[in-house]
Design a protein with these regions (language model features):
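Conserved pre-ATP/AMP-binding loop-to-beta segment of ANL
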Residues: 16, 129-134, 144-168, 175, ...
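Conserved AMP-binding/adenylate-forming core of the ANL superfamily
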Residues: 16-69, 86-91, 137-144, 157, ...
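Conserved AMP-binding A3 loop
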Residues: 28-30, 161-188
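Structural core segment of the AMP-binding/adenylate-forming
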Residues: 45-46, 73-141, 460-462
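Conserved AMP-binding/adenylation subdomain of ANL enzymes
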Residues: 75, 187-204, 212-253, 267
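Gly/Ser/Thr-rich phosphate-binding loop
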Residues: 251-256, 267-329, 342
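Conserved ATP/PPi-binding loop(s) of AMP-dependent carboxylate-activating enzymes
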Residues: 336-340, 351-382, 418-420
Length: 510
């Protein structure tokens, strides 16, 4: 299997095994494939050409999967959009990608997503479908006249090296960049991922990680399709709901960020639920204390707990721990390279450093993205002439090849599993009339792992308070990007070339 259409067709072989559960709705694998086919036919009927982009701005749901896979079945390129984005942020992704279709879930988080987008330019957009409303039914009926032979022809035209998705990830330039991914690399990486974690057809996987993220999409429902595991997507993370679903649906696989497991361990009603079905946890994105791993095994019944490391540009995966690794290795490292991927740690001159010495983590192999969509300059800045992807992360590799992440060159911090980029937040805050200069850094937070903190220089003669500025920011950016604290300063610390010394700002917060 080298294309997503081939994966979907192979999944039909799981037949009447339960494939998907959402509330009181249930689908077998055969029924799931039928729903995907209906969407694929509708895309053909409505004029989706090969390589056209299809954006989905909605929470985890069966319709998200059906639309995404349906588009990919006929050569469309999926463009997931973060549900926490504001209208301007989403419109930028739609416009930049040239998406012709947009799927939304109006009413989610009390937001009318269609209206949010309509106030911003997105000239490429032709169809907007609300997966919660009548337009969804109209969409799936649109393809009823498309023959099986036409569908088969479009499926067969999808090549392994075609793009399957463009996932926009924010960057240090302050504007999201579209990371391109091919069918073949996506399938190969997550076939490997699934084998390492031991996901199988007897598993029932509660997908709490959002589908707009590689963790929920590729390490989520795509991995389940590859292995025949049942999928139970969750639109919003809520500990009581997770506990109830684990108990009633006999969930065995529960990957997620460390905050997920801490929230469960610390919930006062945890002991009222039968969690004995749990067996598989995969985590990363933040430090994992060895004590937490011990408690997950002893108190939550997990047999397999693995940590991993990767970025969107590496198809989500570079290194992974293995099932026979000891708790200290799982806690203190992000594992070793997956098969047939090269990983090195290099200095500022791109020379490999000795084991145990800190440097930038670089990788090379089939997992490396083809590049950023319509951005050759950014691509050349990230992938060197020898094909090495420069992650921007600082780490140390031990004698076994296991990697420990120690810092981030790009100043990114991770808020509850979501990547937050200071430059993007700073650019937004500079839009406030009272803000002259701003620098954002991450600080430790017991619940979220890290949160943002802004150091702000006010404009002369202008006045704004912390609460006012934070509330202003909430209306203009995703909640995880909003600084949790603000310190007003007379000036920012700068080096000789005028660059903000962010390490000094971090020291002030210690």
């Amino acid at each position: 299997m080298l294309t997503i259409p081939q994966v979907v067709r192979a999944a039909a072989e799981f037949g009447d095994r339960e494939a998907l559960v959402a509330g009181d709705r249930r689908w077998t694998f055969r029924e799931l494939v039928h729903e995907v086919e209906r969407c694929a036919r509708s895309f053909i009927a409505l004029g989706l050409a090969p390589h056209d982009r299809v954006a989905v701005w909605a929470p985890n749901s069966p319709e998200w999967m059906f639309a995404a896979l349906g588009a990919q079945m006929v050569g469309g390129v999926l463009v997931p959009i973060n549900t926490r984005f504001k209208g301007a942020e989403a419109a930028y992704v739609i416009d930049r990608s040239g998406a012709t279709f947009l799927f939304v879930a109006n009413g989610f988080l009390d937001i009318d997503y269609s209206s949010e987008v309509s106030g911003h330019p997105a000239p490429s957009l032709v169809h907007v479908v609300d997966v919660t409303g009548p337009s969804w039914n109209d969409f799936v009926r649109a393809g009823e006249g498309v023959s099986s032979s036409v569908l088969a022809e479009r499926e067969g035209a999808v090549r392994p090296d075609d793009l399957c998705d463009i996932i926009f990830t924010s960057g240090t330039t302050g504007r999201p960049k579209g990371v391109m991914s091919r069918h073949d690399q996506t399938i190969r990486v997550f076939r490997e991922w699934s084998a390492i974690v031991g996901l199988d057809a007897d598993d029932r996987y509660l997908i709490v990680n959002p589908f707009f993220h590689t963790f929920g999409y590729k390490a989520g429902f795509l991995a389940c399709l590859l292995r025949g595991a049942a999928m139970l997507p969750l639109a919003v993370f809520d500990v009581p709901t997770v506990l109830r679903m684990v108990s009633t649906e006999r969930i065995s696989a529960l990957p997620g960020p460390p905050t997920l497991y801490l929230s469960i361990l610390n919930h006062p009603d945890r002991h009222a639920f039968d969690l004995s079905s749990l067996r598989l946890a995969v985590t990363g994105a933040a430090a994992v204390p060895v004590e937490m791993i011990r408690r997950m095994r002893e108190e939550l019944s997990f047999d397999v707990i693995l940590t991993a490391y990767g970025l969107t540009e590496s198809t989500g995966t570079i290194t992974m721990c293995r099932q026979d690794d000891d708790p200290e290795t799982i806690s203190s490292t992000s594992g070793r390279a997956i098969d047939d991927i090269e990983v090195r740690v290099v200095d500022e001159n791109n020379v490999e450093v000795p084991r145990g010495t800190a440097g930038e983590i670089v990788c090379r192999g089939y997992n490396v993205m083809p590049g950023y969509f319509a951005d050759p300059v950014a691509t050349a800045d990230t992938i060197d002439d020898d094909g090495w992807l420069h992650t921007g992360d600082i780490g140390v590799m031990d004698t076994r090849g296991y990697v420990t992440i120690t810092d981030r060159l790009k100043d990114m911090f991770i808020v509850g599993g979501f990547n937050a980029y200071p430059a993007e937040i700073e650019n937004a805050l500079l839009g406030h009339p009272a803000v002259a200069q701003v620098a954002v850094v991450g600080r430790l937070d017991e619940r979220m792992g890290e949160v943002g903190h802004a150091f702000v220089v006010r404009r002369t003669g202008e006045s704004v308070g912390s609460d006012e500025l934070i509330e202003w920011a909430r209306t203009r950016m995703a909640n995880y990007k909003v600084p949790r604290g603000i310190t007003f300063v007379e000036s920012l610390p700068l080096n000789a070339s005028g660059k903000v010394l962010k390490f000094e700002l971090r020291e002030r917060l210690r």
